[in-house]
From Swiss-Prot:
Source superkingdom: Eukaryota
Keywords: Glycoprotein, Membrane, Transmembrane, Transmembrane helix
Location relative to the cell: Membrane
Coiled coil: none
Family membership: Belongs to the tetraspanin (TM4SF) family.
Segments in the Extracellular topological domain: 29-44, 91-210
Protein name in the entry: Tetraspanin-17
Function noted in UniProt: May be involved in the regulation of cell differentiation.
Length: 248
């Protein structure tokens, strides 16, 4: 029976390691390729991936080496991991259920002041907006899961072919073209003050938590299963000392 439980524990730890590796790889990749203002992942995402990568590995070593000490480190490490993953899972659930913004932010009946301060601080919102303004960070990858491109960076209706920078048909923020003389309603600051734009920025910030929940929920379930199996095996793990002896 203990062999079966050991097999299940090995499988769950391998899956947890795979989730952690995926999270770390995704976080590091997006850090180099995605917008520095709005990302799907954050430092918390990468940190959680690192914990999921390291702690289950201790369990694998403990099982393979029949090491009581390593297995105890794994057991208490999983307790800490479950507490951390539970915290993020609860936070993800709160964001996803109470902070949903319409797919088309411009049609959301709520105003930005109504939403600021509850789950997204005013400082966080202003920091992201400030980042967009000063880095002109409106490339497609900056907002592939939000409408920031559509509601903040696209040319406003009625502005014709006049653009913020001298490149017909689009606004380019990655290259500093010679600035055109544009009407006030076509200015970048004007667009960032639009409700649809502001709500789309909020939606992009909250999307980080929706993306994290895709990994946090299954990681929490598997961590609880691993801990339960580890508890049942805790007293059966003993170091194999058969190889230790003396030669005559």
């Amino acid at each position: 029976m203990s062999e079966v439980r050991t097999g299940f524990l090995t499988m769950t730890t391998i899956i947890l390691i795979s989730i952690g590796l995926t999270m770390m790889g995704t976080g590091l990749y997006q850090k180099t390729t995605m917008s520095s203002c709005i990302r799907e992942t954050s430092s918390q995402f990468t940190l959680l991936g690192l914990l999921l990568l390291l702690i289950p590995q201790i369990g694998l070593y403990g099982i393979c080496c029949r090491s009581k000490r390593l297995f105890n480190f794994f057991f208490y490490g999983m307790v800490v991991l479950i507490i951390i993953v539970s915290y993020y899972s609860i936070k993800c659930s709160i964001y996803n259920t109470t902070f949903g913004i319409a797919k088309n932010p411009a049609k959301d009946n709520r105003t930005v002041p109504q939403l600021l301060g509850r789950l997204v601080s005013k400082e966080k919102f202003e920091k992201v907006t400030y980042c967009i303004i000063h880095k002109h960070d409106c490339n497609y990858n900056a907002s592939k899961n939000s409408n920031v491109w559509k509601y903040c960076c696209a040319q406003p209706v009625g502005c014709g072919t006049i653009t913020m920078f001298d490149k017909p048909g689009e606004w380019s923020w990655k290259h500093q073209y010679e600035r055109n003389q544009v009407p006030e309603e076509c200015s970048y600051e004007y667009c960032l003050d639009c409700r649809g734009c502001q709500l789309s920025i909020l939606k992009a910030i909250v999307h980080q938590w929706k993306y994290l929940s895709m990994f946090a929920y299954p990681a929490l379930v598997l961590s609880c299963i691993s801990l339960a199996i580890a508890w049942s095996l805790k007293e059966t793990i003993h170091e194999n000392e058969d190889y230790r002896g003396s030669y005559s």
